[in-house]
């Protein structure tokens, strides 16, 4: 009987929220895992919440449902933050100066994907130009 009560004492109830990162605010057409996600986590902590359930984070098919991922291992590229790529030196301020006017009421996944793919190409080109002993290349070599 004592074991049952000690187990209950060790367990604690936690509360949180279910929201996909793509639902976070972003001028890039869809929320991502950049600064806005960090602000959201800070907000959750300030609100006394402990959990953020995100839904699956994999690449999606034509209907863009997080439950229709075509890989259980890959991540959704749209969740890559252009702001963090800028912070890492892989994008320039000028790369982010002409952000399209994405709809605010719903996500235009095709437009967002086309826009972000161009940014990713620029970032990858700059990444390849980094010296082999750069800190970023060293970090990614460990993966």
Predicted regions and their residues:
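Acidic/aromatic-lined carbohydrate-recognition and catalytic surfaces
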Residues: 5, 10-143
């Amino acid at each position: 009987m004592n074991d049952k009560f000690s187990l209950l004492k060790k367990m604690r109830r936690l509360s949180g929220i279910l929201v996909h990162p793509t639902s976070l605010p972003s001028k890039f057409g869809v929320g991502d895992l950049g600064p806005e996600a960090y602000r959201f986590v800070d907000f959750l902590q300030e609100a006394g919440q402990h959990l953020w359930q995100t839904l699956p984070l994999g690449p999606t098919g034509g209907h863009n449902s997080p439950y229709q991922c075509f890989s259980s291992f890959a991540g959704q590229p749209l969740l890559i933050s252009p702001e963090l790529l800028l912070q890492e030196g892989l994008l320039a301020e000028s790369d982010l100066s002409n952000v399209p006017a994405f709809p605010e009421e719903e996500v235009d996944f095709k437009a967002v994907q086309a826009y972000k793919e161009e940014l990713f190409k620029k970032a990858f080109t700059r990444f390849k130009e980094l010296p082999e002993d750069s800190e970023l290349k060293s970090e990614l070599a460990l993966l």
